[in-house]
Amino acid sequence: MARDHVRPRVVVSKCLEFEACRWNGLKISSGVVKLLKSHVDFVPVCPEVETGLGVPRPPVRLVSGETGPRLVQSDTGLDHTEKMMAFAGEFLSGLGEVDGFILKERSPSCGMKNVKLYPGPGKVQATSSKNAGFFGKAVLDRFPGFPVEDEGRLLNFTIREHFLTSLFTLARYRRVKAGGRMAELVGFQERHKLILMAYDQEKMRLLGRLTANREKRKFPELVRDYEEILRAALARPPKSGPVINVLTHAFGYFKKELLAAEKEFFLDALERYRSNRIPLGVPVALVRSWIVRFAQSYLNEQYFFDPYPEDLIEVSDSGKGRELR
């Protein structure tokens, strides 16, 4: 089942494992980013440094303005809003093909949510309002449907698993789209059928009808619609119910070969997964072992059981108690 996985292209905040460019001159440790370096082509960026702020520097913050938040240095009162907005627009416009983003949590520039908003510069208490940082908001606005997370949320194994699944799936799709061949798109749909079944069965059927292409549509037009539906299907983590349905469907391929005790153990694992007592990786590993044991060719082709490189699967499915730092 081992595959030669595609390498996604991911924009990352440069202060995460790449350079000591945070406002206080530090580099931030992130186990997720460190692990992904072997499997991802990262594009590091520090929007604050790129807009002329030095290292170290007085920190910037989001400050309430008449027309919305402003990006202001708390010590000096200097407003960097226009510079940041101009940089974000220029950088993202020239980025080229990209598959996802990992941004610094709660950063007034990179944060994607939960960034504090202050009533003014200086020593004042933050308001109750939470916002996205300026660069983070530009990413979310310009790249809807793309995998975008911060390093803090990626410590949660469920969020991390969803992020990696959607990231590598969309990177594989980008390769298919670049190939320009209908046969490759049909193959992509077939190999991702169980992933799509777990995420959104209705959209899985829509994508199946698109790849059937009974209207004989041209490839560029068809993939535009396919991509829109695919991104919508992968936008949110799958619920446990549909995932269990997929695993039960796969289990059906082996029912005649398995011992009664094996069947009972698997069904018990499904119930424990349903009640959040074990991670998804436990029942998935059982099915993976049967795929190898019984040489089940159809399931062997399904990315549901191997959505991203195996060492990432082991960490992502390690359980609630373990976190990467």
Question: At which residue positions do the language-model features occur?
Answer:
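N-terminal extension/subdomain marker
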Residues: A2, V6-P8, A20-R22
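Conserved acidic residues
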Residues: P8-R9, D99
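Short, hydrophobic/glycine-enriched beta-strand segments
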Residues: R9-L16
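Flexible, glycine/proline-enriched loop segments at strand-loop-helix junctions
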Residues: E19-R22, D75-D79, Y118-S129
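N-terminal glycine-rich anion-binding loop in soluble enzyme alpha/beta folds
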Residues: A20-C21, G25-R70
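Glycine-rich anion/phosphate-binding loops
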Residues: T76-L95
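Internal, conserved structured core segments that host functional sites
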Residues: S93-V176
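Acidic, Ser/Pro/Thr-rich low-complexity regulatory regions
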Residues: R142, P147-R325
